[in-house]
């Protein structure tokens, strides 16, 4: 096979590198090194990345934990489907179940308090997206995803399912209330 435009010199790799090429190679290398070290540095220093833990579980065991959590801390029911609104104690654990077309239950948190979230799926892979904070986690069956969250603004927030889970995917929405 031959090139359409063969090089003028057949042995081009023995030619000295031009200064402008050397400058660009150096800039690219230095920038690559800066970015390589900035990623772990910013993970530690920046506040936008979640440091989460993941544990093996079963859907049955996680559902039992979540239902016990809901039974203990439910304060009211909302919506046409009577979803429980759960207000855990400050510093407590929060359990959320992802399942076909549903994030369960609705959570009510206190502003400025830290909570430990436990997420798991009972059926398929789901995406947990807390908006507008833009926190995203892939939630898988047989795994319990745990992270800490401290709400800093009061209001109503949406939990969006951002992983396609079937024909009712557009219904995979949950709520989060943050109160003073």
Spell out what each predicted region is.
Residues 1-101:
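Extracytoplasmic entry segments of secretory-pathway proteins
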Residues 28-48, 64-65, 137-180:
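Extracellular/periplasmic metallocenter environments
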Residues 92, 113, 124, 172-173:
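Residues that flank catalytic or metal-binding motifs in active/ligand-binding sites
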Residues 101, 133-135, 164:
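Residue-level signature for short turns and capping positions that connect secondary-structure elements
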Residues 102-105, 176:
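Generic preference for hydrophobic/aromatic residues in regular secondary structure cores
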Residues 106-110, 114-158:
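Membrane-embedded segments
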